[in-house]
Amino acid sequence: MHTQIHNRPTIAIIDTQALIHNLNVIRQITGNADIMAVVKADAYGHGARICAEKLQDAGVKWFAVATLGEALELREAGNTGRILVLGGCWPGEEKAFFEFGLTPAVFTLEQVRRIDAAAAANKLTATVHLKFDTGMGRVGFRYNLADSVADVIRKLENIDVEAIFSHFSAADNPAESDFTRLQNDRLDKIIDAFLQVGIKPRLTDIANSPGAILFPESRRNLVRIGGLLYGFKGDILPIETEKPDVRPVMRLETEVAQVKTINPGDSVGYGRTFVAGEKRVIATIPIGYYDGLPRSLSNKGSVLVNGVLSPIVGRISMDWTTIDVTEAGEVKEGTKVTIIGRDGELELRAEDIAGSIDTISYEITCGISRRVPRIYI
């Protein structure tokens, strides 16, 4: 047995007050619709246990995760809310779903029949959310098969269809607005098919973060919100859209481990991909690609030191990154370095990092590894 001591200065600071601020901003926009907080992938890297706890304390009733394992982590942490498992119920998981009061997203007839049989064997009724593919092309009953799916499900005596839902594929793209509205219309027709056979879902939902902002008609009585809760907006809403006042929840910081001056011709890092053309001041910081700083930022990304944008030079290593702090004023061992967050007048957001390497903000924060302690404030 040993006690873990986290003295390495690379940390992710999670601002739970910003999280609740964002929740309240979203509530003002979505009105009477309940909010389902999407906390899959460890709350997009922010820490699902604590984030879900704070959100439940603030009145959130619904949570969405990807897997049974993620759902059980929330239950073990004391979460008593409703939990939707978007990844469905895999064979052999039925008993755990029943025991822990979890709700599966169901998207094949094989799934729903298996859950019905397991519910019958346990003398109970299984509550499910039926997922339809209205244009995403991923998992879900095809929208044009709603009549036949409804006919099968109405005969299953141990299934309670609490919700019918779908997922927008391009709500963030103004050029695809007509298709987004078509998806919403398709969901209406799916619901009608179930009403025709006597199945009336108590909840219907299709709106994700961009859908809830840009398409008010899609809010229905439940919205699934992920990115906006964590303060992402720059790359999940169109550039021309007025952005809601959501704040980044994660700050990623470290400290300088060593400073040295290099001369013209000196190289930095593996492969000698950076060779100094003049005298430069180089700082090494204890964060690398294992911590979640993408290696593709090598010789491309920047960090903030003393409020000054300081470029990454050389290749990012597994545990270390080198930065040029020549223009950053006095820099010494222990000087704070901001990878995500504000320092003085400048701010680096996850979407800024993502944009420089052709990815999305979600991938940046989801990629921050467990080696980086989350500090909740």
Stretches with model-predicted labels:
Residues H2-I20, N24, Q28, E70, ...:
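Active-site anion/phosphate-binding pocket segments in diverse small-molecule metabolic enzymes
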Residues Q4-H6, T10-I14, A18-H21, Q28-D205, ...:
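Active-site-proximal beta-alpha core segment in soluble small-molecule metabolic enzymes
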